[in-house]
Amino acid sequence: RKQCFDKFKIGNCKDCFIGIRKDTLDGLLIGDSFANHTAAFLDVLAKDARLYIHDSAAGGYPLMNNVNEDGSARYPEKYAIDRLNYAKKFKNIFIAANWEGMTENKDRTLTLKTLGELIRIGKKIIIFGALRSTSDINLHRAKLAKAKIPVYLSERDFSTTEYKRPNNYIVYEMKRKFPSIIVINLNDVMCKNGKCKIELNNTIVYRNSNHLNTSGAILLGKAYLITHNNPLKELNFKQHN
């Protein structure tokens, strides 16, 4: 999957697809680096729902491209525009991004405006809510413990706090403004009673403080399907009725 992230390519479905290959695509996954690490999670759900999804992601391009406070584009706009126009060909659009990092008013405004436009033309939007961040030092200690390196660690619980996200967290804003969107919250698997695990099946799922590793994303997808109905099956059902 070396052609799927930061290559600014669109439509290279043979190189970059998720789920079950079929004659026609069921949708497109777009976003920034969070979309890249969510792909393996989505692959588990897509295979279970028998969906065929293409993905195209690049850093700094959550839905469109990040913008400065004066409204100017932080990165070249062509990829964002071309990717969005391509996405409009499909009924289902999957979006994963660093939503916690989206605090600038101009970024938020552009994202919500674009989402509204997609919903108005009949697109089904599926948003992925990212895991709570851990700290680099916590992750480092967990890896030391996992490697059985003989170091003294005063704390062996490497779970992270399920800190409260602000009321204006953009995923909450999306759901308030556009109730029809589906939000798949990865925290539902990892967090309980105010604590969030960083491991599944004795495997650390984080690559760094806020990104999943591939094996962790796959485990997360499998764990999600054990405790939740697969929301993507509803998409497949609607497309065939």
Could you say what each language-model-derived stretch is?
Residues R1-N241:
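Extracellular/periplasmic envelope-modification machinery, especially enzymes
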